[in-house]
């Protein structure tokens, strides 16, 4: 089931929306769905309604994207749980998770110490973010985070609840003499972030390359990406004191979906790259060692 609002932007029409109509290679057809228990518990699941290609609501009012498709696979595979889908803004997701309105939130979240203290989280990655610096094609001075700092380049502001903010914040802590100008901002879609770089308003953005690969040609932005800044595990966030059996059941399915290639297929479908084939991907784990 799905509760949310209709979302339709021009950038998600035409060829991009054709992607959401493709059948998944694994785990998505009715024949593979398990029969639900008569006592299956309903889980309130929430995704971001406007975060292509991670999750969004298409012109037919369907939740889709990497997170949307993965949650549908999980819902079909879980015997003792059934998902009720919600799609809202990122801020509303966090509020609803904090108040207990939602049990599980999916928005390619990175795990931070603050999030681990405030919420429960999956013990297995739901995906991998290949984080890059996104710059204009004619920008030849930015190749890494150090170039942002030494060149006093303008970085697109980042929402403080986004772990990309923490990545830059941690860099600044380790380099007190060479700081990146980090500014907070409200919610922005990937398209808006990339447009801010393409227009020259900012020099660079830090963002998963999958979103750039999915949007660059469609929006004719003439952007390119640096080498990888790092591979980061994505996690589900759960409301505090969530039934540990639910988390355990979903973690077990995530392991199985990685093993059978479903996660790699979703990555190719939505990010235009198989993040699981990247060097170091096999070593990406959910880490709670904050030191």
Language model regions located:
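Bilobed "Venus flytrap"/periplasmic-binding protein-like clamshell domains
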Residues: 49-52, 60-76, 132-179, 183-189, ...
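Acidic, polar ligand-binding/catalytic clefts
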Residues: 72, 84-149, 223
